[in-house]
Amino acid sequence: MAASERRAFAHKINRTVAAEVRKQVSRERSGSPHSSRRCSSSLGVPLTEVVEPLDFEDVLLSRPPDAEPGPLRDLVEFPADDLELLLQPRECRTTEPGIPKDEKLDAQVRAAVEMYIEDWVIVHRRYQYLSAAYSPVTTDTQRERQKGLPRQVFEQDASGDERSGPEDSNDSRRGSGSPEDTPRSSGASSIFDLRNLAADSLLPSLLERAAPEDVDRRNETLRRQHRPPALLTLYPAPDEDEAVERCSRPEPPREHFGQRILVKCLSLKFEIEIEPIFGILALYDVREKKKISENFYFDLNSDSMKGLLRAHGTHPAISTLARSAIFSVTYPSPDIFLVIKLEKVLQQGDISECCEPYMVLKEVDTAKNKEKLEKLRLAAEQFCTRLGRYRMPFAWTAVHLANIVSSAGQLDRDSDSEGERRPAWTDRRRRGPQDRASSGDDACSFSGFRPATLTVTNFFKQEAERLSDEDLFKFLADMRRPSSLLRRLRPVTAQLKIDISPAPENPHFCLSPELLHIKPYPDPRGRPTKEILEFPAREVYAPHTSYRNLLYVYPHSLNFSSRQGSVRNLAVRVQYMTGEDPSQALPVIFGKSSCSEFTREAFTPVVYHNKSPEFYEEFKLHLPACVTENHHLLFTFYHVSCQPRPGTALETPVGFTWIPLLQHGRLRTGPFCLPVSVDQPPPSYSVLTPDVALPGMRWVDGHKGVFSVELTAVSSVHPQDPYLDKFFTLVHVLEEGAFPFRLKDTVLSEGNVEQELRASLAALRLASPEPLVAFSHHVLDKLVRLVIRPPIISGQIVNLGRGAFEAMAHVVSLVHRSLEAAQDARGHCPQLAAYVHYAFRLPGTEPSLPDGAPPVTVQAATLARGSGRPASLYLARSKSISSSNPDLAVAPGSVDDEVSRILASKLLHEELALQWVVSSSAVREAILQHAWFFFQLMVKSMALHLLLGQRLDTPRKLRFPGRFLDDITALVGSVGLEVITRVHKDVELAEHLNASLAFFLSDLLSLVDRGFVFSLVRAHYKQVATRLQSSPNPAALLTLRMEFTRILCSHEHYVTLNLPCCPLSPPASPSPSVSSTTSQSSTFSSQAPDPKVTSMFELSGPFRQQHFLAGLLLTELALALEPEAEGAFLLHKKAISAVHSLLCGHDTDPRYAEATVKARVAELYLPLLSIARDTLPRLHDFAEGPGQRSRLASMLDSDTEGEGDIAGTINPSVAMAIAGGPLAPGSRASISQGPPTASRAGCALSAESSRTLLACVLWVLKNTEPALLQRWATDLTLPQLGRLLDLLYLCLAAFEYKGKKAFERINSLTFKKSLDMKARLEEAILGTIGARQEMVRRSRERSPFGNPENVRWRKSVTHWKQTSDRVDKTKDEMEHEALVEGNLATEASLVVLDTLEIIVQTVMLSEARESVLGAVLKVVLYSLGSAQSALFLQHGLATQRALVSKFPELLFEEDTELCADLCLRLLRHCGSRISTIRTHASASLYLLMRQNFEIGHNFARVKMQVTMSLSSLVGTTQNFSEEHLRRSLKTILTYAEEDMGLRDSTFAEQVQDLMFNLHMILTDTVKMKEHQEDPEMLIDLMYRIARGYQGSPDLRLTWLQNMAGKHAELGNHAEAAQCMVHAAALVAEYLALLEDHRHLPVGCVSFQNISSNVLEESAISDDILSPDEEGFCSGKHFTELGLVGLLEQAAGYFTMGGLYEAVNEVYKNLIPILEAHRDYKKLAAVHGKLQEAFTKIMHQSSGWERVFGTYFRVGFYGAHFGDLDEQEFVYKEPSITKLAEISHRLEEFYTERFGDDVVEIIKDSNPVDKSKLDSQKAYIQITYVEPYFDTYELKDRVTYFDRNYGLRTFLFCTPFTPDGRAHGELPEQHKRKTLLSTDHAFPYIKTRIRVCHREETVLTPVEVAIEDMQKKTRELAFATEQDPPDAKMLQMVLQGSVGPTVNQGPLEVAQVFLAEIPEDPKLFRHHNKLRLCFKDFCKKCEDALRKNKALIGPDQKEYHRELERNYCRLREALQPLLTQRLPQLMAPTPPGLRNSLNRASFRKADL
């Protein structure tokens, strides 16, 4: 769509005077839409500058809340309970706290324990949940609120539901007779039919004569009923992408878990059962080569087997009987295996020997091997009795977890496809409630697979030399290979059944890794499930939240190969010792399975006869809370005697070693390689390491390391990082004051501890990320304490504030970096956010809920302000200050009694602000990266300060000291400057900083002086404004400022912050009645506007001052919508979305539910009306075409009147609207389109943005007090009021209901992001938002469209986008969307109607009311013409009746088109399927007639318009129901009969005559409905109806336009053009009779060159021009401008049809009119179009480039066709239509109409003998015909166009033989030529024309031969003379001419017809003519051969010689035939014979 068509309503604005207009606006506030809004007229403050806000607190003091009535009181001030302190108990997963009990804890452990049990301290803003940040309006919440909406009834939906209504019950197969031959039903029967119909119900009050005021009141009351309270609940939710203010409260810190898998061990069975077997489960990651879980020990032995160990066992603890385990996997991978190891009781023999029975003996052979089994059982019993406490490795296997979780049962796990040496398992899937489909995309996800039961059947025996984890990883890697080495091993056969499933959310009977009971734990006696601790494959960054202190000991290997003696069966015992006495072993080692919970010692499995065993054992220990220097692990090595020998002990100690657990205060972990002592360690050994060579001790292998062991701690107490350890140690030393203290090699004293602490603070940045994140809460707490509680050393305060602050910045940065992947959209780290929200508390305070205790006096003191502090912050303080505390004027080293008070007075927020302001550049950079954290910390500190000190009652101005506020000012200025300077370098950081600053200021609004915060906002705005002037890319800055404003406005008390209750608004007055309107001041009268009201509706200085935040937001919107705004498209969306989001929030906020409150809230947005009104030219045009809307504003604009108004704004679409049909896209041009709007209006808004803005406008109109709107309307100028009406018009178009079918068709794609939006948004982003460039470019590369320019108008592309990107919705969802859309359309229209009523009341008695009311009526008419619900139409028609009743002159004395338009609308609704609509439409139409009659005792105008409307309506509306229209006619008749007021007049009689007349017209024209699917018949009917109105030019013109529209719809542009030419001729004929102007056509004759058919328009009757008759030829088409419009449309259609020559003829008639009007612009355009037309003619001279049409003769035969029987037509079909195509189309159409097996196509072209046809069938004969021209015509028809235009005669030929065959031998082959003449020349106003004359000529065989030879000769001549020559074509023609042919070649023709001289003298002439033809043929062959010889190459010489030989043979054969002479040839021929010869051959020669 061209810009000029899109913005028709703005055409009247004159660009040349734009500067003057701007000046005038700044002086006079005239409100031109294109004047700059940058100057606010009230105080002269430009919009680009921020006004000084009011002092908020002072304003509130001067206006206490009690001053407001009732509910408005809550809008004045924040609620008293706005801020509260919550102590939320920390969530504990276990039933026991799990913290150390009654132990003397050191400072570090105590601090950790306290942290893990203390409550969360939460500062709660009680109403924050109501803000847009925390309670967003989303699609889901909207849907919830939309429940219970009433269903609106729409005509288009009703018509779809009632297809089987009476109107469709007629027999669709009845004859399609021609209407012109069908007699009209008699008047008597028509009257009878109408009288017998039932009328609809009558409106009881219609015939009452009520006062207008009463009618208005009644209408308003009815309109107010059952309205939805929240308009925007019906509108789609705000765009989530724009919601920069979106926040969510962080999740409380919780223990980290990965994806959890539940493994249940069900049973373990071997072929033989002789001894107990014990199992171990663990997870291993092969890729990472890491064990990723602790061990789970299970015991599935039977009681009898367990009984064998009774001698060694104690009563097993319930926790060791677990058979289920929950494993956690943080990093799922396809390389994870569940490894199952089996152990057995130690026995004599190596592992292979012990496994042999299990591999050899089978259960089926039990009887055969009974003795062996008994022997084995006996041996096993002995070993269990003696060696029961020792274990030995037995077997192992592994399950590949990825196969389990990814397969859906496809794997056949019963089959051992990879051989017997591979572990086999079967998989049985349980299909139950937990059955979940596996994700095919993510095969490694362990969270959503189907539970599986595995049966593991094969185990591998353990190999003594390959027990280490390294060997295990090799085995596991090998298992995945097809050629596994394990296949060659013999398996240990067993059956282990295990269940693997996703772990449930809250499993019952679950134990933590510390064996604590996890909630819920219903019964302590139930068999537990164990949570297995994960050892993540990679780092996991999560803070510790609970106490955990576990130590894992992994003995790896022992090398006793050099040890002398019998040391072979080695076992390692481990003990946790608190001292050196054997009794000091602590019971902290976790038991395995079926044993006690904790033990004092544990042993490794024994490898038989191995002096250098490897171990896979894992010992798990519970570390004591306090680990001291004496705590150590003692390892004792035993030789175990497997065979009982007399005098030999069971176990012999053969070595000792140990590991001290604490060294320099740090827990020792990691790998160790320890020497082993042969002797027992000496006293005091525990404080030393074994590496120290103690005197007198013997060591294995000369004190070398022979025992490899590894310690791993999982502790939330011990950081295990040197830098963190040192930091915590130093802090706790300072807290305890325990000097001196040894730290590694350094002895800390009071003198050097400060230096060490500073170094430790600086070194924190070197800490490992994982422990730093884990202990981040501890670290941050300590740093906060150091900032605000500086330690005292030797009586001196150590100023560590800066160092601690810098350390805090680095720690936060490290934590951020580590958790980068987990950050939210705003770059916040969830863990840090959770720390601030939950964990942070002010050190030294015990938070409790304030309960009236006296406030603690706290002085505001800050640390020293360094030299980096800006000079502006000193505020002229001259007092000398202490280096550590600025409030102390004392020497730094002095000790004062007030030190304790000072220490208690440091406030974190003050220190943070100060340190930030004075920080160095490096630190500041780190802080800026994560400014949000420090801002939130500061805010929480301030809130705690107020809450704990009970300062909330303190006036806000006194809550915080001035110095702190100065620091805040400097800080905000500094951060704001960073935002501005970084926006072009690091956009992402700038965005995050901008948002952080906005949220900080928003938070401050709840805590400090709000006027102070507003001043900060203003300062920031000024900073941005300053930079904007020099910015290379202002759009980026404007975007950030927009987001900044949006965040500020998301505050939960946004409305209160805008001071809504202060007296800027005028006092409300009651809505005036008609009688009281005179007392009001009105712009239409001489009084001046009310400045108070004006300032409320404009972005005036007072408005922006008082409503500061609303002013900022609306100012941003106004600036973004300015035509010259930078980055407009992106800013439009952002600004409009911000307003929309706020209004949605108001609609859903329960605080504003009452109408009075919401009205006060709406006042904050009143300038939105002016903004939208002025933005009108750039809003998306939702109307189908310009229509009425383009003329509302201009009609009221006084500047457009006068001579410049040549445009008269005639628009053909107006007439088409009356006719009920749309024009073709190219036909909307008006004579006065003016300059293209886009160049003037700037960047147009997208459809989505425009619609959202209009929804916001409607919200304001709906919720504002009507009296206030009325006073505003009173002050508007006429142009402003016109633009307001334009806006309302656009609202109606934007929210028009699309119908259920539209939702089904596009699956609810109502204003979602189209490709157009996406492309433009990307463009905007690429220009402004640098951080997103890569993403956008990538998405663009993937786009199938490449360059997205001009995508806006690529409808096909947009359609593709809609259908391909949509998410398919269910029928219920589409039903719901249609329901909501219907309610939205209804409510939007009702709001518009309410506003129109207000405007009508405003201008009722003004001087300019006619022009305003005319525009109002146009909007009302548009609303009635669009798709509306029955509910709205009731109210809309009531308003229309009231309007026409009060101002009848609008319709009957002013604009004719208004009356025509109204009649059309009412008549359409009279035909509605919905009875209520018909009732109201009938009432309106009746009242219209009555009012017209009361004015002049005649209603000729209404009669004429209703008649015209009915004709148009029935002719063009498809879903029109004539039955319902008849009922409405009956209803009107009933009104006339019951109206007593006009009983004595002729009114009732006239109404009756009109109704009967309409009824008859309806009956006549209703046939058109039957032929909607038959385009030819439909056009014929329209043509005949138009011809029937030959005496009524208005109606004929209407029908011609209808036909043009239909033709355009069908793509028949030539025919559409002819319709417009006929219409223009009709108008010209009328104008020529009315007045004589030289520049006008003289009538139809002037158009004869365009079409000879046009002369039929001259039949115009004189009485039409009678001035006495009202309403005839009164349409605007019957003017010069109307004629111009019709001619332009004709030219447009001709151009589209490729008939460029006709375009010239049209413009020949148009140019003189334009010259007479001196419309040079239009003339330039016309000549440009002529140039284009002529250029195209030149380039398409051959004619092949444009094919004009194909013609067919179609004959209809049979009674089924009715009046078409035996009729012949010539059909014009699209170019290159084949005979088969039209045959198929017609056959298919009539088959559908008449039924199967009825229609037959006659295949030949022979004359049809009807007597031979089946009377029950319908026959169609179709023949291809060609245009025929006489010889004299060909002289004039030179060009291809000439031979395809103005065609009346057509020819077709039919071959036949005397015996009836089509083809036969040459002597009997005849040909019939048929000439057809049509009534009119093609192209005509229809595509089929009746044949009016037929002439046939029969050719004899010789004449046929003559024609054939002439044709061959012409072909030869053409091929020979072709330039450039075409050798191939020439040879082809030659070959066909001289080559030997099978039959009917030239030689055979000659032999047949020339061999003998005919006996009949009549044939002599034909004989001679054929002879001459052959002579000419031979000559042409010779010429062709000569030409061919010149063209060929050497390779074709032989071929040419062959052609010459053939030619010679042909010539020789022809020679005797051609030399015969006819003796009587020259004899005189009788006259009669001469004539017959002429007749027979005259027209055939050149065919």
From Swiss-Prot:
It comes from the Eukaryota. GO terms for cellular component: cytosol; perinuclear region of cytoplasm. The modification Phosphoserine is found at residues 178, 872, 880, 884, 1308, 2036. Residues 20-42, 136-190, 213-254, 410-444, 1068-1090, 2025-2047 are annotated as: Disordered. Residues 548-714 form the C2 DOCK-type domain. GO terms for molecular function: guanyl-nucleotide exchange factor activity. InterPro entries: C2_Dock-C, C2_DOCK-type_domain, C2_domain_sf, DOCK, DOCK_C/D_N, DOCK_C_lobe_A, DOCK_C_lobe_C, DOCKER_dom. Residues 20-31, 160-174, 213-223, 244-254, 411-427 have a biased composition (Basic and acidic residues). Keywords: Cytoplasm, Guanine-nucleotide releasing factor, Methylation, Phosphoprotein. The modification Omega-N-methylarginine is found at residue 865. Pfam families: DHR-2_Lobe_A (PF06920), DHR-2_Lobe_B (PF20422), DHR-2_Lobe_C (PF20421), DOCK-C2 (PF14429), DOCK_C-D_N (PF11878). Residues 32-42, 1071-1089 have a biased composition (Low complexity). One of its GO terms (biological process) is regulation of Rho protein signal transduction. Coiled coil: none annotated. It is found in: Cytoplasm; Cytoplasm, Perinuclear region. The DOCKER domain may mediate some GEF activity. Acts as a guanine nucleotide exchange factor (GEF) for CDC42 and RAC1 small GTPases. Through its activation of CDC42 and RAC1, may regulate neurite outgrowth. It is linked to Adams-Oliver syndrome 2: A disorder characterized by the congenital absence of skin (aplasia cutis congenita) in combination with transverse limb defects. Aplasia cutis congenita can be located anywhere on the body, but in the vast majority of the cases, it is present on the posterior parietal region where it is often associated with an underlying defect of the parietal bones. Limb abnormalities are typically limb truncation defects affecting the distal phalanges or entire digits (true ectrodactyly). Only rarely, metatarsals/metacarpals or more proximal limb structures are also affected. Belongs to the DOCK family. This is Dedicator of cytokinesis protein 6. It comes from Homo sapiens.
